[in-house]
A protein has these predicted regions:
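Short helix-coil-helix linker/hinge
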Residues: 3-10, 66
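Basic, amphipathic "hinge/linker" alpha-helix immediately C-terminal to the N-terminal HTH DNA-binding motif
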Residues: 58-75
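Short amphipathic alpha-helical interaction segments
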Residues: 33-48
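A short, conserved structural fragment
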Residues: 47-57
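Short amphipathic alpha-helical interface segments
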Residues: 8-22
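Short acidic, hydrophobic short linear motifs in intrinsically disordered regions
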Residues: 22-31
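Amphipathic alpha-helical dimerization/coiled-coil segments
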Residues: 74-84
Length: 84
């Protein structure tokens, strides 16, 4: 099995958020096939770059993709298309 690059992980994380809408950390970690602690690191990275935003869903943190995150996801998918 081939290791995933950081860009693959970012793409999988953003695709999971896009599919599920407002998503909690557990759903994102399952969808992106990451341990929860690694998913938190990825979400912090994406949040610092304004690609996802953190919201409160009741008492829990949840994440939503920003328009900039959608553009970034589309760019990653375009690059993948040319690399495969």
């Amino acid at each position: 099995m081939e290791r995933r690059t950081r860009h693959d992980i970012y793409r999988d994380t953003l695709e999971t958020i896009r599919r599920t809408g407002l998503s909690g950390i557990t759903r994102i970690s399952y969808g992106a096939n990451l341990p929860v602690d690694r998913a938190r690191e990825v979400l912090t990275y994406l949040s610092e770059r304004n690609l996802v935003k953190e919201e409160l869903n009741g008492k829990r943190k949840a994440y939503r993709m920003t328009p900039r995150g959608g553009e970034f996801l589309q760019a990653l998918q375009t690059v993948d298309m040319y690399l495969d």
